[in-house]
Curated annotation (Swiss-Prot):
Keywords: Acetylation, Metal-binding, Zinc, Zinc-finger. PROSITE patterns: ZF_HIT. This is Zinc finger HIT domain-containing protein 2. SUPFAM superfamilies: HIT/MYND zinc finger-like (SSF144232). Interacts (via HIT-type zinc finger) with RUVBL2 in the presence of ATP or ADP; shows a stronger interaction in the presence of ADP. The modification N-acetylmethionine is found at residue 1. GO terms for molecular function: zinc ion binding. May act as a bridging factor mediating the interaction between the R2TP/Prefoldin-like (R2TP/PFDL) complex and U5 small nuclear ribonucleoprotein (U5 snRNP). Required for the interaction of R2TP complex subunit RPAP3 and prefoldin-like subunit URI1 with U5 snRNP proteins EFTUD2 and PRPF8. May play a role in regulating the composition of the U5 snRNP complex. InterPro entries: Znf_HIT, ZNHIT2. Zn(2+) 1 binds at residues 7, 10, 30, 34. Zn(2+) 2 binds at residues 22, 25, 38, 41. Coiled coil: none annotated.
Length: 399
């Protein structure tokens, strides 16, 4: 049944009969042109419905919510309102109506993606802002002396970031890889206080080892949340502080390897989803950030990342209600500001830290390859993924 009355968005005296209804406020409209004039209202409706549904799920809901931003791009290329996911008559039933229209196999496939934390495969790959143009050759030059091919492991490759497709998933949910442009780099803070103004005594030499831990968590969280979403700011910061012991628990590390292992252990223990990077990928991205734009301005990326973190934590603190959460976010923000001042005055320490990250990345890669090779040999010996049942060699017969 079509909505009664004229379109609510046509110019006065030119109103056409209404054929569609806004799903949020039920205002009638006649065409795609009028819908676009009222598009923000419809976007908010679908956004609220999707976020409300996904907040109850534990498998990376934020990266699915990011797909809402792509709806605007899709609508700009559509010719008919029906193609934009709208239908004549009353407002649609939201996610529940869409879910009911899925086939049983499609429902099972989608639930499997959520349970495995792989729903991000439905989205295009996200390109980090620190993947600047020509980064590959410069990284190879900077880490050319790194042992065991660490330099080659750090060469950017957009296709590496998304997880590998699962073989038993339908083709409809396989991700289409693309070379998307990266987000604009966050601005480096214009005013960075002197380190002496933040600390009365001598700065500990162990401060430097907190950077790999913080940047590991930063790269992991950005990739997991597909660049971040203001509506999920609280979730973003909870993941960030959960992965980074330096920010979330004021942890101190004796080496870069220990700092990276602490963050990697959080992911390997299943406390947070591994995301598209995994532990090795986050180590690799931490090294890239530490290397910066080049020898002439190496600290630029690290300063931009720490400044971005300080601003993000500040916004989250304003939204937080619980005193404990506000205090935790405040301390994490202060830590980022301290590291910002330290980095600004200790640029020479960044290259050794980047090499430590590259070495740790290579060690994890070799260990993973060894485990995969051993697993393959055992499965070949067993004839499957599980060992065969034990056979009874001697059995006592009843007397």
């Amino acid at each position: 049944m079509e909505p009664a009355g004229p379109c609510g968005f046509c110019p006065t005296g030119e109103a056409q009969p209404a054929r569609y209804t806004c799903p949020r406020c039920n205002v009638p409209y006649c065409s795609l042109r009028c819908y676009r004039a009222h598009g923000s209202c419809a976007e908010e409706f679908y956004r609220d419905q999707v976020l409300g549904e996904l907040r109850g799920r534990s498998a990376s809901p934020s990266r699915l919510a990011t797909a809402l931003r792509r709806l605007r791009q899709q609508r700009e290329t559509e010719d008919e309102p029906g193609d934009a996911g709208l239908r004549p008559g009353p407002a649609p039933g939201g996610l529940s109506g869409l879910w009911e229209r899925l086939a049983p196999a499609e429902k099972v496939a989608f639930e499997r993606l959520l349970s495995r934390g792989e729903a991000g495969r439905l989205l295009p790959p996200w390109r980090p802002w620190w993947w600047g143009r020509g980064a590959g050759p410069r990284l190879l030059e900077e880490l050319g002396d790194a042992p065991s091919g660490d330099a080659e492991e750090l060469e950017p490759s957009p296709a590496r970031m998304p997880p590998e497709p699962v073989r038993d998933e339908p083709a409809a949910v396989e991700q289409v890889l693309g070379d998307l442009p990266g987000a604009c780099p966050p601005a480096v803070p214009t005013r960075i206080p002197a380190l002496a103004s933040l600390s009365r005594g001598r700065t500990s030499p162990l401060v430097r080892f907190q950077l790999p831990n913080v940047l590991f968590a930063y790269a992991h969280t950005l990739a997991l949340y597909h660049g971040g979403d203001e509506a999920l700011l609280s979730d973003f910061c909870a993941t960030l502080l959960g992965v980074s012991g330096a920010l979330g628990a004021q942890q101190v590390f004796a080496s870069a390897e220990e700092a990276l292992q602490a963050a990697a252990h959080v992911l390997e223990a299943g406390e947070h989803p591994p995301g598209p990077l995994g532990t090795r990928g986050a180590m690799r991205e931490a090294a890239r950030i530490l290397l910066g734009e080049g020898p002439a301005n190496q600290k630029s990326y690290t300063l931009a990342a720490l400044g971005d973190l300080a601003q993000t934590l500040g916004r989250a603190r304003k939204q937080a209600v619980a005193p404990e959460e506000r205090d935790r976010l405040y301390r994490a923000r202060k830590k980022c500001q301290f590291l910002l001042s330290w980095t600004n005055e200790n640029e020479d320490a960044l290259t050794p830290l980047a090499l430590d990250c590259a070495t740790a990345h290579r060690a994890h890669t070799v260990a993973a390859e060894d485990v995969a090779a051993l697993t393959g040999e055992l499965e070949q010996l067993w004839g499957g993924p599980l060992p065969p049942a034990r056979r009874t060699l001697i059995e006592e017969l009843p007397g």
